[in-house]
A protein has these predicted regions:
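Enriched for short, Lys/Arg-rich terminal
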Residues: 2-4, 13-17, 23-26, 62-92
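Residues that recognize and position ribonucleotide moieties
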Residues: 4-5, 43
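Short alpha-helical scaffold segments that flank and stabilize functional sites
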Residues: 17-18, 35
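PIN-domain endoribonuclease scaffold, especially VapC-family toxins
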Residues: 26-34
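Short alpha-helical linear motifs
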Residues: 31, 52-55, 70-75
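A short, surface-exposed loop/turn module that caps and links secondary-structure elements
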Residues: 34-60
């Protein structure tokens, strides 16, 4: 069963800036979102729970250097996209 991706306003702005700066990652970005929508537990996504001040959130790898932070709501089959950027940017 596919999950619905919910683009928060913050994520929309961040993704737009990110893709403008990293045009070479546009295809990878789309592929990761497609995989996330179909199976968030796909091993290639490297989904992992966050801790500390990000408790309750998860992250998936876009590349080795870049992450997408999200809130996974499995009861409603919703995935709330929160942030995208480098490791340091998204975990600030």
């Amino acid at each position: 069963m596919p999950f619905s991706l919910v683009w928060t306003d913050t994520f929309k702005r961040t993704a737009k800036k990110f893709l403008k700066k990293h045009r070479d990652l546009a295809d990878t970005f789309s592929l990761v979102l497609h995989k996330l929508e179909n199976d968030p537990h796909d091993p290639e996504l490297r989904l992992h729970a966050l801790s500390g001040k990000h408790l309750g959130k998860h992250a998936v790898s876009l590349t080795y250097s870049y992450r997408i932070v999200l809130r996974l709501v499995l009861t409603d089959t919703g995935i709330f996209l929160l942030d995208v950027g480098t490791h340091d940017e998204v975990y600030r």
